[in-house]
Amino acid sequence: MMLEIPDVLTSAQLRQCREALEKAAWQDGRQTAGHMAAQAKNNQQLAQDDPLSVELGEFLLDRLGKTDRFIAAALPLKVLPPRFNRYSGGGNYGNHVDAAIFSVPGTPHRIRSDISATLFFSEPDEYEGGELIVEDTYGSHAIKLPAGHMVLYPGTSLHRVAPVTKGVRLASFFWVQSLVREDSQRAMLWELDGAIQRVTLDTPESPALPQLMALYHNLLRRWSNT
């Protein structure tokens, strides 16, 4: 399931993040990639232990916890601290699949990358190219969202970032281990949750509502791992 999450950040929050990122100490992104991925990667990235990366990452985690659409779609169990990248001057990232398991910095813990996420800090008209291109069974999807918007897509997806031929593309990216590992099951729960919300608004006294809610929670109980 691929899903856009609009307005994760307010205009004021977005402006503060951008001002900080524009002054950041960017490093060669290949330093954080594995051997194979490094051959396809041509961008800049904040070091994970950079104080700004830590500060902004904690801020974004707080925002995600208050974003209902993200919670309902991702059903997050663990979220890897967000990372930050910068593309300019032809920077790109060739086709790759993200690692299945990531270590949580500064801890002995690891997470499984069920869901990949990208949050855009740059407006689409501020740079040329730079589309996030995700491939699935239905073809290729080019994603270039307004600043403050985020996209979620399965961690199993082959994807790439097209060359940024003009301007600068700033973004955050991270991974989620979901309560529900299987993407198709998460998609069904998302659709069912949406149906419950519509029935709640349209006919709150409907006798079908408690049945739908029971079905949702029983499926979540069956499919989830905690």
UniProtKB/Swiss-Prot annotation:
Residue numbers binding Fe cation: 96, 98, 159
Coiled coil: none
Gene3D superfamilies the record matches: q2cbj1_9rhob like domain (2.60.120.620), Rabenosyn, Rab binding domain (4.10.860.20)
Disulfide bridge map: none
Enzyme kind, highest EC tier: oxidoreductase
Binding residues annotated for 2-oxoglutarate, in chain numbering: 169
GO molecular function: 2-oxoglutarate-dependent dioxygenase activity; iron ion binding; L-ascorbic acid binding
Cofactor: Fe(2+); L-ascorbate
Pfam family for this entry, one: PKHD_C
Swiss-Prot/TrEMBL keywords: Dioxygenase, Iron, Metal-binding, Oxidoreductase, Vitamin C
InterPro entries membership: Oxoglu/Fe-dep_dioxygenase_dom (IPR005123), PKHD_C (IPR041097), PKHD_hydroxylase (IPR023550), Pro_4_hyd_alph (IPR006620), Pro_4_hyd_alph_FE2OG_OXY (IPR044862)
EC number, UniProt record: 1.14.11.-
Cofactor note: Binds 1 Fe(2+) ion per subunit.
Domain Fe2OG dioxygenase: 78-178
GO biological processes: DNA damage response; intracellular iron ion homeostasis
Record-given protein name: PKHD-type hydroxylase Plav_0377
